Amino acid sequence: FCAGIGLEHPDITNASRAIKETEKKDCASNGINPIEYMIGYDGITFSNSKGSEQLSLTKEEIFKAVSAKVMSNGMIVDNNFKTWSDINPSLPTIEIDVLAPPPSSGTRDAFVELVMHDTCKKIYNMSKKDYKASCSALREDGAVTEAGENDNLIIEKLSANKDRFGRFGCSFLDQKKEM
């Protein structure tokens, strides 16, 4: 995107998020003036298998399950929540296991902004600089696994493990209601 002009570079691309300021700067440095045009909206789901226990999770509970860092006794610490009931005793004692899109994914960007940053701002009352630094990284201890961009594969993995959660767009989920 915006690497240059000519046959070897695309004239049109699409994304599931707005153009970032850093991308606009990259475009400008390559002599390109990007035109952003919104075609529609989608949503993000946090889903598990149809045959699984259906949990009613808050954004705060999801944040606490997937964020690399959480607040404990007024300090930002590594996330040590192992089960959903560690986060909220009313949730079942099942291991936290979440499939996440890769860092290159617009779905991940949207999730980080709409769930992680938004929740972190509210529950920890942090400045933008602080919450972006402390609340952007996903866990790397096995509770969260990058699953790639293939939503069909994520569906297969959710079907194979009833306790696992995954994220993808609402429009994709709508097409896969039977799963």
Regions found by a protein language model. Give the residues of each.
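Flexible loop/hinge segments at secondary-structure junctions
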Residues: 2-179
